[in-house]
Design a protein with these regions (language model features):
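Charged boundary/loop elements
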Residues: 25-32, 88-178
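Non-catalytic, peripheral interaction segments enriched in hydrophobic/basic residues
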Residues: 1-107
Length: 178
């Protein structure tokens, strides 16, 4: 295929779901903004996108996502983790609800348990404290608010370089944005 738009659409349809497989469980360690590009799956996704665009490996990740119309996999992983939490919390299985409560209690002793990693990532969002309070009290997380916070956080990358003169700043992202 020599049509990048078709390849990118196929990637969004098939590659992104494959990259999400089981991410509700293993992906929580990559939900923090500072770790979103640490995952091998995300690295492969970016390499694929850069290959489709024909750019160098050194091209800024955010510019590649913007050019391709893709989100970082972290966005999808975050959404999947919130849906899993809400589903387990509201499950009609008493055992599953007990597991969620036990993991919530365990987070104070083990910083790498599922709930602790989710809370660490939630804290970074604009309404992070409200999200964390909801989890700690066993309430539902509002998926639409979490997604809006994530998108705003992703846009902040561009807000930081908005209006900067590319001749005065050496970052590639500044040159791409302006």
């Amino acid at each position: 295929l020599n049509r990048p738009d078709t390849v990118l659409w196929l990637a969004k349809t098939y590659v992104v779901p494959a990259g999400m497989y089981g991410s509700q469980i293993w992906g929580t360690q990559y939900l923090k903004q500072s770790r979103q590009f640490d995952s091998l799956v995300q690295t492969c996704h970016l390499s694929f996108l850069k290959g489709v665009l024909g750019t160098k490996r050194s091209a800024p990740n955010w510019a590649v996502f913007r050019e391709c119309g893709h989100e970082p996999l972290r966005f999808y992983w975050f959404r999947a983790a919130v849906k899993l939490y809400n589903g387990m919390r509201a499950s009609n299985s008493e055992l599953l609800r007990k597991v969620v409560r036990a993991d919530c209690a365990f987070m104070y002793r083990a910083h790498h348990c599922w709930t602790a990693e989710l809370l660490t990532a939630l804290q970074e969002l604009e309404h992070g404290q409200a999200h964390c309070d909801a989890v700690k009290s066993g309430e539902e997380l509002h998926l639409s608010l979490c997604c809006a916070d994530l998108r705003k956080q992703n846009r902040s990358v561009w807000d930081a370089v908005d209006g900067l003169n590319p001749r005065e700043h050496a970052e590639k992202l500044v040159s791409y944005h302006n």
